[in-house]
């Protein structure tokens, strides 16, 4: 589990909605997705457990890390590599009582929150949103310049998320980050695999300082 790299193109899912859900996830991974997170705010726990177990298997087949959003119990029961938590979720200490895998933490636009997360054992932090996003309509929008300082505050992987697409992704050129997370930029695309491939190329350029 821990040898899987926390780096690159990070896909966060929509809520589960049927068989096509898995097809799109597989297409996205084959297009270049490096990390997968299952986020589902509407389905019953029994459905989410079934879906999370299926995604655990898919991610394992492709050798990529798989995270469950919000719920350490679900992550444990599904056999996921990690859980991702935000400000409305239990703190890292409580998560550790339930789940012993990787922990990703949303740190929004707060460098102190990122530092605290690292000290408590977070595996990575995720800053954002930096742009408007329809996926989380109540998400705050933060100043991208916070990324100029982020690497001085934390040594663990830094991801960015929120309203990122082929146009806005170029705004991250020149910043020291480890990966970029998207939802609609891939899953709402007409050709999911092609969208993932195009984003992956941009992500690789950014995290390797080629832009």
From Swiss-Prot:
Binds 1 Mg(2+) ion per subunit. HAMAP family: TMP_synthase (MF_00097). Mg(2+) binds at residues 70, 89. 2-[(2R,5Z)-2-carboxy-4-methylthiazol-5(2H)-ylidene]ethyl phosphate binds at residues 133-135, 163, 183-184. It comes from the Archaea. Condenses 4-methyl-5-(beta-hydroxyethyl)thiazole monophosphate (THZ-P) and 2-methyl-4-amino-5-hydroxymethyl pyrimidine pyrophosphate (HMP-PP) to form thiamine monophosphate (TMP). Its cofactor is Mg(2+). InterPro entries: Aldolase_TIM, ThiamineP_synth_sf, ThiamineP_synth_TenI, TMP_synthase. This is Thiamine-phosphate synthase. It comes from Thermoplasma volcanium (strain ATCC 51530 / DSM 4299 / JCM 9571 / NBRC 15438 / GSS1). The keyword Transferase applies. Belongs to the thiamine-phosphate synthase family.
């Amino acid at each position: 589990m821990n040898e899987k790299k926390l780096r690159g193109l990070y896909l966060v899912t929509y809520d589960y909605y049927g068989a096509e859900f898995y097809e799109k996830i597989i297409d996205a991974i084959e297009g270049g997705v490096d990390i997968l997170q299952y986020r589902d705010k509407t389905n019953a726990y029994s459905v989410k457990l079934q879906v999370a177990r299926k995604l655990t298997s898919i991610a394992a087949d492709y050798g990529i890390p798989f995270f469950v959003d919000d719920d350490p119990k679900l992550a444990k029961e599904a056999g996921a590599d990690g859980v991702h938590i935000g400000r409305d979720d239990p703190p890292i200490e409580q998560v550790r009582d339930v789940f012993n895998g990787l922990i990703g933490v949303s740190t929004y636009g707060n460098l102190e929150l990122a530092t605290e997360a690292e000290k408590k054992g977070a595996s990575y932090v995720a800053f954002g949103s930096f742009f408007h996003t329809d996926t989380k309509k109540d998400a705050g929008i933060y100043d991208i310049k916070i990324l100029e300082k982020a690497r001085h505050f934390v040594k663990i992987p830094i991801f960015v998320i929120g309203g990122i697409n082929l146009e806005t992704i170029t705004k991250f050129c020149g910043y020291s980050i480890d990966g970029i997370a998207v939802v609609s930029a891939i899953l709402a695309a007409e050709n999911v695999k092609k969208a993932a491939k195009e984003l992956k190329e941009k992500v690789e350029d950014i995290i390797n300082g080629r832009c």
